[in-house]
C-alpha cells in the first residue's frame, strides 16, 4: 500500500517508445477535484498502464484513487476503509458463530418396551415394569391405607410387599448400618383411598435399625413398615 509520502516523491514515468524528449502534460500537475467527495486536496500519482490518457490521481480527503477516463469503483483501494471492512466481516462471522453455537438441539429418547405378562382380573401387567411392584403406585396407596386402618399404625412397604421375592428369613429382615437405632413412624391417620382386597397381609408399621459402632453386619430388627 503506497503511503502519501512515497507517492509525493514518485516521479511520473514516461511511456515506452516515446523517448526522453516528451514532456509531461501540464494539466496533470494541477490539483483536480475528487469526483467522489469533490475535494481539491488531491494529487497526481502516475499514469495507468503507462498511458497518458489514463492519469491516476489520489484524494487525500476520502483516501481513494481514481483514473481519468475510467469508471469509479465502489471497492476501496487502500486507506482506512479497507480496515473497517475487515472489522465488519470479523464481527459478522463472530455473530454467526455465536448464533449457531447457542442453538439447542433436542435429544432423541429411545423408548423402552416391556413384554406383556398375564392378565389378572382384567388388568394386564408387564414384566420388569413399575406396575409389577405390587400393582403400581395406586396399589401402594391402597395397601398403606389398609395397614393404617387395621394395624397399629401406617407405614411404608417392605421389600416383600413389592414382589421382590425377599420374604422373612432372608438377610433383609435384619439390617445393621452402624448408626444406632432409627425408627421411621408413619401417620396412622391416613384415609382409605380405594377398596382393599382380602389377600393383603398385615405387617408392622415402622422401620427400625439398631446397631453398634464397633460391628458391621445384620442384627435383629424390623425392616418393613
From Swiss-Prot:
Name the PROSITE patterns for this protein: ZF_DOF_1, ZF_DOF_2
Keywords, sorted A to Z: DNA-binding, Metal-binding, Nucleus, Transcription, Transcription regulation, Zinc, Zinc-finger
- Summary of the function given for this chain in its UniProt record: Transcription factor that binds specifically to a 5'-AA[AG]G-3' consensus core sequence.
Any GO BP: regulation of DNA-templated transcription
Q: Which GO terms describe its molecular function?
A: DNA-binding transcription factor activity; transcription cis-regulatory region binding; zinc ion binding
Ranges where the record places region Disordered: 1-27
Where Zn(2+) is bound, by residue? Answer: 34, 37, 59, 62
Q: Where are the zinc fingers (Dof-type)?
A: 32-86
GO cellular component: a single term: nucleus
The molecule here is called Dof zinc finger protein DOF5.8
InterPro entries recorded: Dof (IPR045174), Znf_Dof (IPR003851)
Q: Which organism is it from?
A: Arabidopsis thaliana (Mouse-ear cress)
This protein's source sits in the domain of life called Eukaryota
Question: Where do Basic and acidic residues bias regions lie?
Answer: 1-10
Protein's cellular compartments: Nucleus
This protein's gene is called DOF5.8
Amino acid at each position: 500500500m503506497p503511503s502519501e509520502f512515497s507517492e509525493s516523491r514518485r516521479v511520473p514515468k514516461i511511456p515506452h517508445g516515446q523517448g526522453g524528449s516528451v514532456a509531461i502534460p501540464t494539466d496533470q500537475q494541477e490539483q483536480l477535484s475528487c469526483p467522489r467527495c469533490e475535494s481539491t486536496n488531491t494529487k497526481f500519482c502516475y499514469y495507468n498502464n503507462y498511458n497518458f490518457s489514463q492519469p491516476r490521481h489520489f484524494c487525500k480527503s476520502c483516501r481513494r484513487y481514481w483514473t481519468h477516463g475510467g469508471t469509479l469503483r465502489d471497492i476501496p483501494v487502500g486507506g482506512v476503509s479497507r480496515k473497517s471492512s475487515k472489522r465488519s466481516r470479523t464481527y459478522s462471522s463472530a455473530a454467526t458463530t455465536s448464533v449457531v453455537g447457542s442453538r439447542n438441539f433436542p435429544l432423541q429418547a429411545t423408548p423402552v418396551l416391556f413384554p406383556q405378562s398375564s392378565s389378572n382380573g382384567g388388568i394386564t401387567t408387564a414384566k420388569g415394569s413399575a406396575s409389577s411392584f405390587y400393582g403400581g403406585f395406586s396399589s401402594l396407596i391402597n395397601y398403606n391405607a389398609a395397614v393404617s386402618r387395621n394395624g397399629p399404625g401406617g407405614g411404608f412397604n417392605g421389600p416383600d410387599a413389592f414382589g421382590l421375592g425377599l420374604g422373612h428369613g432372608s438377610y433383609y429382615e435384619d439390617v445393621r448400618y452402624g448408626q444406632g437405632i432409627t425408627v421411621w413412624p408413619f401417620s396412622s391417620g391416613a384415609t382409605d383411598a380405594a377398596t382393599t382386597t382380602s389377600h393383603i397381609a398385615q405387617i408392622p408399621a415402622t422401620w427400625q435399625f439398631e446397631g453398634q459402632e464397633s460391628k458391621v453386619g445384620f442384627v435383629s430388627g424390623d425392616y418393613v413398615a
